[in-house]
Amino acid sequence: YRSGTCWCFSALSFVESEILRTKGVEVDLSEMFVVGKSYRDRAIKYVRLDGHLNFAAGSSFGDVLHVIDDYGIVPQNFTEGYGFNYGTELPEHNELDAALKGYVSAIVKNPNRTLSTAWINGFDNIVEAYFGEIPATFTVDGVEYTPESYRDFLGINYDDYVNITSFTHHPFYEPFVIEVCDNWRWDTAYNLPMDEMMEVMYNAIDKGYTIAWGSDVSEKGFTRDGLAVMPVEKKQAAAGSDQERWVGKAADAPKEEVKAELPEEMVI
């Protein structure tokens, strides 16, 4: 909706598919649990780096697995209303994102010349005010779990998965950190030639595995129409929430720019 959290919804659906494949269990996991923990980790890293890090709503696939690995996971039905403690039924994070960025930016200025022991608690309290509280324990099919023990029951293991990519500014057949702002955790991806990357993906799908695909939805040629347009005319990347980048602001019609006839370099 009006948030920059598409990365969490898409990556968590991949995790749910993997659980169905490996355990035969259908689960609906809490996206906002992951988002809340991600905010916290991001704030700590932002402060450690004196503000020299992207602090925004966007993130990447690996963030979801990192959060599950570090904090566990909670079913959606035990967090109904969590993440929406501010009067809307869908994520609307513009105010929250601005408040959190303002808070960590003030902390980075270090007015006391040393960090207090209270700053992270203050950050947590802002997130809790907007999101609500997470249950410490919950019961599924008669068994009581914590977020960590539920993760272990589901068998989600970060080390079971690998990122692959295809860029020409790094050597092939080696891992590297993809230099984009949303990769704030500095996860590495194994670099393959484009045709080999596609071959790996098709092979995985043919064998019954799920693929999580990461793309930049802020690019002007990105649409829901099942194609990618690379116009000769260069335009500025779209700003705003994921929803606005996909289909325009809620009050607007879908973006007419991508429907306009322009000279094209390539249509895929």
Name each model feature, range by range.
Residues 1-268:
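Catalytic-core signature of thiol
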